[in-house]
Amino acid sequence: MKKPLLLFFVFIISFNYYSQGQQLHFTNQYLQHNSMYNPAAAGIANKNMIGISYRNMWSSFPGNPRTFMIYADKALEKLNAGVGAYLYRDETGPTSRTGAQLAYSYHIKSNNSNNKFGLGLELRALQFALDKNKLNASLGSDPVLAGSSNKLAIDAGAGVYFTNGKLSAGAAVSQLIQSKLTLANVPNASSSGKLYRHYNFNMNYKIQTGDDIYLIPNALVRVIENSPSEYEFGMNVNYQEKIWWGLGWRIDQFWTLQAGLKILNRVSLTYSYDYYQTPLSMFSGGAGAHELGLKFYLEKPAQ
């Protein structure tokens, strides 16, 4: 298959993906990114940190999807609150998304000091861009190519979250406003060119199997308007909060293997690999996804 045709194929997938399907930046290390999926989780773990991550999918394809993120999470204990922030850039073929996400959570403690409830709000900004120079000149009559090269959209979300140190669970909705997002120069275009609401439901539970080892079964469900729902389940093993490994499965999409370690109680490193069950698997090599995350703790986390 010629490279220009492959590039156009990737463009069609990515434009359709962002205009009608899942439009939020993605990580398979979601246990490391609670506030990314739910603003109410911001600061609730009381682990002040900053981090970076890089995700590389389907490397055998030209213009394969890549995601870069920098993020932070901080508890505001005097205010019974927490804040979280994400800056990210997605690149897929000739398309790219650059975005920012700010989250604020108010924390409510019950009489049992281990029980915490979070009520959160988030603000998102997304710039979707198209590099027309990367597309074949023969596609010049396409209405998408006749439109603007970039589009900025602002949206918001909200969530609730609960944790008691063992059980954590939450529900959130992103892109409540459903701002318009289309590059096509087509009169009376359908409403599909917009940000769709994403509903996220998550739960995990720590099971102590010894003095030093925890099993953590976890689940994440995404309900996306105008797109199939996604169900992700996993099991992690954590040893002394210093070494962890796990297995995950997103139904009908991919399996995930991941492992990580903490260095000097101030730095943690996590690597994961996705093996896709989709038709991409027919291509030899490069049809999976690699993700690497690095966190820097601003204070020594409580053990």
Give the role of each language-model region.
Residues M1-P4, S110-N112:
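Positively charged n-region of N-terminal signal peptides that target proteins for export
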Residues K3-L5, Q22-Q23:
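Short, basic/polar N-terminal leader/transit segment immediately after the initiator methionine
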Residues P4-F15:
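Sec-dependent N-terminal signal peptides
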Residues Q20-Q303:
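Subset of outer-membrane beta-barrel
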